[in-house]
Design a protein with these regions (language model features):
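C-terminal/domain-terminus segments
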Residues: 181-189
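Functional-site microenvironments in short loops/helix caps that host divalent-cation chemistry
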Residues: 1-181
Length: 200
């Protein structure tokens, strides 16, 4: 039974993209939320259609840092500086109770928290973001070009960055700018999305 192995998921009868929380809901109030349930291949299809692309992992991390170096988060090293939540993650007892101290239990509108030094919102928390690269060893574990390093040329998994609203220090504290996870590129989830990059 999936509910026993992943107790933070729940079945919602009648849910679909037009009614994400069930038959009495709609997407009207979600227009400023990140797009979710996106597999890597979905993100690639959108990029081809729009003339944009997914960022490479190194580009994503550079953008996430917002001009800071050697910091855990886009704003510094404190998770909640001066008691102010800076990203959408799980608060409370994971997975039993989300106290919503940051104001959200699921995705949050993209401008709910302050932007980083480059003016980018939600580089950590809210939804995991696909990047272009195949998953492989960390760049610092092998010799890569100093400028524009790319991941392996092949593999079975792609990389997601940034963490999500389901991340909690007791379970998944991968909401730091340097954290990453391997993911099957055919999988999607309610906490997976993407952002695009462009070339000048």
């Amino acid at each position: 039974n999936f509910a026993r192995t992943a107790p933070w998921w729940r079945y919602v009868d009648g849910a679909c993209w037009r009614a994400p929380e069930g038959p009495d809901s709609n997407v009207d109030r979600r227009q400023n939320h990140p797009v979710t349930h996106i597999a890597w291949y979905d993100a690639i299809a959108y990029c081809k259609w729009s003339g944009l692309r997914l960022p490479f992992e190194a580009e994503w991390e550079f953008a996430a840092r917002g001009g800071l170096s050697r910091k855990k988060f886009p704003w510094g090293n404190q998770l909640v500086p001066k008691g102010e939540h800076m990203m959408n993650t799980w608060q409370g007892d994971f997975p039993k109770l989300n106290t919503e101290d940051d104001g959200w239990s699921g995705t949050a509108p993209v401008d709910s928290f302050p932007p980083n030094g480059f003016g980018l919102f939600n580089m950590t928390g809210n939804v995991w973001e696909w990047v272009q690269d195949f998953y492989g060893p960390r760049s610092h574990q092998k010799r890569l070009p100093e400028r524009d390093p790319k991941g392996p040329d092949q593999g079975s998994q792609r990389i997601q960055r940034g963490g999500s609203y389901l991340c909690h220090k007791s379970y998944c504290d991968r909401y730091h700018v340097h954290s990453r996870i391997p993911s099957d590129p055919t999988n999607s989830a309610g906490h997976s999305g993407f952002r695009v990059a462009g070339d000048q």
